[in-house]
């Protein structure tokens, strides 16, 4: 497979991932973090970093809007639910493990 075709396939898969996340607003970012150690905000950060690597200035809110398909504040108001105590405890444990691994 040539590089251009590979890039086009990767881009198509990424667009499909974004649409899947937009269609499944019931899946909360904290759920994604707990299961896969990334979330929509991570994707926005990676998107913005990729833009910066190519000399394109992009503010984080603009990257979030690309990932969420709407301004983050709007998505949060419509779809984000309060994290449960169990979810928060699990996130704290993951953070502790990450910090311990970094030392």
Per-segment meaning from a language model:
Residues 1-103:
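Domain-level signature for proteins that mediate thiol-based redox and metal-cofactor handling
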């Amino acid at each position: 497979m040539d590089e251009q075709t590979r890039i086009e396939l990767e881009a198509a898969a990424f667009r499909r991932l974004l649409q899947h996340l937009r269609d499944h607003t019931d899946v909360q970012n904290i759920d994604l973090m707990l299961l896969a150690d990334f979330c929509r905000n991570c994707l926005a950060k990676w998107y913005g970093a990729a833009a910066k690597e190519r000399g394109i200035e992009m503010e984080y809110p603009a990257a979030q809007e690309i990932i969420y398909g709407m301004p983050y504040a709007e998505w949060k108001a419509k779809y984000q639910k309060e994290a449960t105590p169990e979810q928060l405890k699990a996130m704290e444990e993951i953070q502790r493990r990450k910090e311990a691994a970094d030392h």
